[in-house]
């Protein structure tokens, strides 16, 4: 879409956004039709097959979507296929579309390679425009190797989800800083010693608690290290689902912490960059009519995508970076 030739009122801007969304949704529905009907999404030579279960009677546009990542990893195709089938039975939300995708590869890092992000974006878009999912009620969860994926995907794709839950996984090099606006649950058995999963979960629990103390408006979390449980938690991890469904996505948070890992992105909430870079870190907050960039490492140019959901665009605004006023008007 081209920029508006004149300034728009809030009502006119909302009307234009709705018109643009209707047009874009129609384009996406047509673009994704074949993949949706084949139950297999494709991108850059990779294929993400899906199976689903449905429950409840929410109206079109109000349905929730639960994306549940299976375990397995570098165990061979037959094992991963079995884990995929098992994942379809692990959880049953009372309402919504429960989708278990099959990882495109049979590697140890099958859920956090670079192609996964784009494939999940296609899956989410298809279920929004073709199956009536509410974009603010998309949830992510995963078990074992799927939990590894949630540790990684949660922080780097936080703006897509309402909440996420990690079960019995290992974070590898993931960090929780990007979870500022994504409620995050973790469930691990206290006796799940392989790869130090139990200790890693304790470490993440402490990190999330510290982040929550420093920033009480963010880092909502639930951490359960289950006594006497090993890698299999006897279904006690299902307690994550009613906790998750309390939340809706915060699409326009007043504070954003964006940390890029080895899979980079060009956008995150209402921030965008021309090119993502490993280790880049940006913190931006809105205070009244002031946009304040408090941290920007590894970023040459930063784009702020504004909305009346953040501040009153009918009034003057100010943008500050490192204590300097960059824009006022």
Describe the function of each predicted region:
Residues 61-65, 94-98, 134-138, 157-163, ...:
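Loop/turn elements at helix/coil->beta-strand transitions in domains of secreted/extracellular proteins
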Residues 62-130:
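Active-site machinery of serine-nucleophile hydrolases
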Residues 297-315:
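Surface-exposed beta-strand/loop patches in extracellular or lumenal glycoproteins
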Residues 72, 103-104, 190-193, 228-229:
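Acidic beta-to-alpha connecting loop that harbors the catalytic carboxylate
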Residues 185-189:
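Short beta-strand/loop motif that positions the catalytic acidic residue
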Residues 136-180:
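Primarily recognizes the serine-hydrolase "nucleophile elbow" in alpha/beta-hydrolase
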Residues 193, 199-292, 296-299:
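C-terminal catalytic histidine-bearing segment of alpha/beta-hydrolase fold enzymes
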Residues 1-65, 325:
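A domain-start/cap signature at the N-terminus of enzymes
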């Amino acid at each position: 879409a081209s920029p508006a030739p004149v300034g728009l009122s809030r009502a006119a801007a909302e009307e234009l956004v709705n018109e643009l969304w209707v047009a874009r949704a129609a384009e996406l529905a047509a673009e994704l039709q074949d993949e949706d009907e084949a139950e297999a999404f494709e991108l850059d030579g990779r294929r993400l097959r899906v199976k689903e279960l449905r429950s409840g009677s929410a109206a079109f546009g109000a349905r929730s979507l639960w994306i549940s990542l299976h375990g397995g990893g570098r165990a061979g195709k037959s094992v991963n296929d079995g884990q995929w089938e098992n994942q379809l039975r692990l959880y049953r939300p009372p309402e919504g579309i429960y989708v278990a995708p099959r990882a495109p590869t049979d590697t140890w890092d099958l859920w956090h390679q670079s192609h996964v992000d784009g494939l999940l974006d296609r899956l989410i878009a298809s279920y929004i425009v073709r199956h009536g999912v509410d974009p603010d009620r998309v949830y992510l969860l995963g078990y074992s190797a799927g939990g590894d994926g949630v540790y990684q995907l949660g922080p780097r794709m936080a703006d897509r989800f309402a909440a996420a839950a990690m079960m019995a996984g290992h974070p590898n090099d993931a960090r929780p800083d990007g979870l500022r606006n994504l409620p995050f649950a973790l469930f691990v058995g206290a006796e799940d010693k392989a790869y130090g999963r139990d200790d890693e979960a304790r470490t993440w629990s402490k990190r999330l608690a510290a982040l929550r103390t420093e920033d009480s408006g963010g880092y909502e979390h639930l951490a359960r290290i289950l006594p006497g449980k090993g890698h299999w938690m006897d279904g006690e991890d299902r307690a994550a689902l009613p906790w998750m469904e309390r939340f809706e996505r915060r699409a326009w948070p007043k504070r954003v912490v964006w940390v890029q890992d080895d899979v980079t992105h060009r956008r995150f909430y209402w921030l965008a960059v021309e090119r993502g870079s490993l280790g880049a870190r940006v913190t931006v907050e809105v205070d009244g009519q002031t946009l304040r960039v408090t941290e920007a490492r590894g970023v040459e140019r930063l784009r702020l995508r504004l909305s009346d959901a953040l501040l009153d665009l009918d009034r003057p605004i100010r943008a500050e970076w490192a204590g300097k006023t960059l824009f006022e008007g």
